[in-house]
Amino acid sequence: MEEKILPIALRNAIKYNGKANPKAVLGIFLSENPEYRSKAKEVMPIVEKVVEEVNKLSLDEIKKKLEELGEDVKKKEKKEKGLELPNVKDKVVMRFAPNPSGPLHIGHARAAVLNDYFVKKYGGKLILRLEDTDPKRVLPEAYDMIKEDLDWLGVKVDEVVIQSDRIELYYEYGRKLIEMGHAYVCDCNPEEFRELRNKGVPCKCRDRAIEDNLELWEKMLNGELENVAVRLKTDIKHKNPSIRDFPIFRVEKTPHPRTGDKYCVYPLMNFSVPVDDHLLGMTHVLRGKDHIVNTEKQAYIYKYFGWEMPEFIHYGILKIEDIVLSTSSMYKGIKEGLYSGWDDVRLGTLRALRRRGIKPEAIYEIMKRIGIKQADVKFSWENLYAINKELIDKDARRFFFVWNPKKLIIEGAEKKVLKLRMHPDRPEFGERELIFDGEVYVVGDELEENKMYRLMELFNIVVEKVDDIALAKYHSDDFKIARKNKAKIIHWIPVKDSVKVKVLMPDGEIKEGFAEKDFAKVEVDDIIQFERFGFVRIDKKDNDGFVCCYAHR
């Protein structure tokens, strides 16, 4: 058995800088050798012994030992280098460019992480560009929220650029396009223009004289015109109608949270983005393949100004289900009192995940694994939770927790003091104490009359009556008797000195119950494991007990 465990432990140690995790190794071993699953408790000491020996070795010694077992570590490392950018000549300049309409959510993390990863890999600069040229979609507090979220995620920003600070710059380049005859002011009715565009027919404004366009442009800037746009001259017969003379400036008189009513003409994304990407010196741009058409539109800007285009990498769509990601829906829900805030555990914001106990390293790692492949990807919450578990398991103290509690009175059993480790693998964490004196809380819907149960780490009972208060009789101590009778193992909390706990679940449910008395020692922000329930982060501690946020199993 040790021969099978050793290579798993060595690979795990290489993955985590020379330190293998016994539980992770056991999990891999059991998945590869399912015949041992029923003997997991017997296998664990062997795994711990192998891991202990492996962790004494240096990283080079671990690699050498794995090679002695026939694995080509260098080839594997080369293969796992994985993420590469095309056409890297020197240092790279990249950008993460969210709209400040709210804090970042899990979907934003992919672009943030991958841009950061490549800048760190190749050297260079990462620019945070806040694209706030639509006053209607700007949340003032989001500017700082986004910076805070990136800092927590471990993304290092070298420069912050805010587009609303650059409006005059966009005007300068917009005017140049008009002067070159590549853009024109269009006052056509939008529906009429759409009909002409779909037929591949130019509108009446397209051939207007440059001088007349410049005069109209100035009137736009002075707030004298409404319902007009500046359009870029492209191919009016282009196979994709959306690319035919698309708009690059529009009139918007909604006051901007940062600049007030100073401006009433704003650039559209397919103008401001290429101008900024060029002037800020972008070498590589990561974007979803849903932006392929935008890349084609922006190519006209590069062509007209004679600029070299950066390297565009279009990756597949990341499909994220079972969570709220729409910023407008979240904002509306917060305003209406449906959600407690941007960190409500039902939401998909990084703040909500942080509150639940998801580590930034776990999010960073899963986004690296998803990478820049062109195929669409369905996001796996289970994979994120598995990575997070590897990070938190070793430090998470263990406690019992019962929810929807029912009081159970047990007759015929003597008072007993039970001492259990705070962590099965960390004796230095000390012990916790549970004192049985006849009355306990158990999970409310677990009991049936005339059935045997085993109170975890204690003894066997037979339930006689289930009512508002349940009654049972002591049966025996021997675990073998419980196994023979197929008795369900249940958690229990002594009624005396129990601690009130609420657990906020991601689906909106609130599980109320009790934890054991030593749970009172935990502090806010600790991450612990309620055995057979899951990992939780301590969110609040007061005279009414504790509020915890559920992370995962």
UniProtKB/Swiss-Prot annotation:
Location, primary (coarse class): cytoplasm
- InterPro entries on file: aa-tRNA-synth_I_CS, Gln/Glu-tRNA_Ligase, Glu-tRNA-synth_arc/euk, Glu/Gln-tRNA-synth, Glu/Gln-tRNA-synth_Ib_cat-dom, Glu/Gln-tRNA-synth_Ib_codon-bd, Rbsml_bL25/Gln-tRNA_synth_N, Ribosomal_bL25/Gln-tRNA_synth
Short sequence motif named 'HIGH' region, residue ranges: 98-108
Q: Which GO terms describe its cellular component?
A: cytosol; protein-containing complex
Lineage, top-rank taxon, reads Archaea
Q: Name one GO molecular function term.
A: ATP binding
Catalyses which reaction? tRNA(Glu) + L-glutamate + ATP = L-glutamyl-tRNA(Glu) + AMP + diphosphate
- Known function: Catalyzes the attachment of glutamate to tRNA(Glu) in a two-step reaction: glutamate is first activated by ATP to form Glu-AMP and then transferred to the acceptor end of tRNA(Glu).
Q: What is this protein called?
A: Glutamate--tRNA ligase
Q: Which gene encodes it?
A: gltX
